[in-house]
A protein has these predicted regions:
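Active-site-adjacent "subsite" loops/lids of carbohydrate-active enzymes
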Residues: 1-18, 28-29
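Active-site clefts of carbohydrate-active enzymes
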Residues: 103-128
């Protein structure tokens, strides 16, 4: 355990020394909190501006571990349900209040309508949200406490599933309704 923790911390320090300004940590909630507490604290001593994004939703990733931002997965699923007509604005307002109460005031919540997992496995935001996709994207940019995620091609309105484990062609930028 200690050897693995040290090796992981060494790799993070290596990349910080190369000029990386932070990390997105996959499945951060599955890594012991003690590792994050120790490692983030040690790295921030030398790199106080280091930015840490947790793929996870637990408030303790912020309050105990030192992550700046975490994925708002619950919001993502709620936006999909609203787009399908299964949930409504009262549930969104309840989520906003609950999320603000659960997370520290300085925690950024990564808000998104798509990402590499959702696009590959569940479909594009247009497939999942239909005509509501644009409105849901606006919400991810404007809800309180949020930090929007723009996934590959969203800035262009691409309605394409990208392969998860294969090389995939990125379409050329074309003039369209998004710019």
């Amino acid at each position: 355990k200690r050897e693995v923790w040290d090796a992981m911390a060494d790799q993070m320090r290596f990349w910080m020394e190369k000029g990386v300004d932070g990390f997105r940590c996959d499945m951060a909630c599955e890594v012991p909190l003690e590792f994050w507490q120790e490692t983030i604290s040690a790295l921030r001593a030398d790199y106080p501006g280091m930015y840490m994004l947790a793929e996870g939703e637990e408030p303790k990733l912020h309050s105990l571990s030192g992550f700046n931002s975490s994925y708002a997965w619950e919001l993502h699923h709620l936006l999909n349900a609203i787009a399908r007509g299964e949930k409504n604005i009262p549930e969104l307002l309840e989520y906003i209040q609950k999320d603000a109460e659960r997370h520290p005031a300085d925690a950024f919540r990564l808000m998104f309508t798509s990402n590499h997992d959702e696009n590959s496995w569940a479909g594009t935001e247009f497939e999942r949200m239909g005509d509501a996709a644009k409105l849901m994207a606006v919400l991810t940019f404007t809800l309180p406490g949020g930090q929007p995620l723009i996934y590959t091609g969203q800035e262009m309105g691409w309605n394409k599933r990208f392969e998860f484990f294969e090389k995939d062609h990125i379409p050329a930028w074309e003039k369209n309704e998004y710019f």
